[in-house]
Regions:
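Conserved catalytic core of nucleotide polymerization and phosphodiester-bond processing enzymes
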Residues: 1-139
Length: 139
């Protein structure tokens, strides 16, 4: 096979991405199983799900900590899931979550500026329903 290569990329926020180019068998026409374009997406996707979402989870946690009616329960990629009691105004909770999430650029800049300037607006979408399959309303 072909010799393996390794490399790494450090994002502006300090996150280190390591990648490995595996040996390819001789019969594979001297191709490797790693495409250099794969690493190009790491900083973009990593900024969203590796930096911004965890930062904002902390802000959301601080805002809802101790509230038994609003429980932060999970994340899936860039989605954040809450379990909200039927006893509270869901629209009010949704607006609060949306407002907090749309402040992500300000929060990000307060932590990383002047090293990194995040000057793009982020729009957050909030949906709710009894289950994922029943989510219909959007803010």
């Amino acid at each position: 096979g072909l010799p393996a290569g390794t490399g790494e990329l450090q994002s502006e926020t300090g996150r280190i991405y390591r990648f490995i180019e595996q040996d390819a068998p001789d019969w594979s026409d001297r191709q490797t199983d790693f495409s250099p374009t794969q690493i190009k997406n790491y900083p973009v996707q990593g900024l969203a799900t590796g930096d911004i979402v965890p930062m904002m989870l902390g802000v959301l946690f601080d805002n809802f900590y101790g509230d038994p009616d609003v429980l932060l329960i999970n994340t899936v990629h860039d989605s954040i899931l809450f379990d909200v009691s039927d006893d509270v105004n869901h629209k009010e909770v949704a607006r609060k979550i949306k407002t907090i999430m749309e402040q992500a650029p300000d929060y990000f800049n307060s932590r990383f500026n002047p090293k990194i300037k995040f000057d793009l607006p982020l729009k957050a979408e909030v949906q709710w329903g009894k289950s994922w399959g029943q989510m219909t309303e959007t803010l």
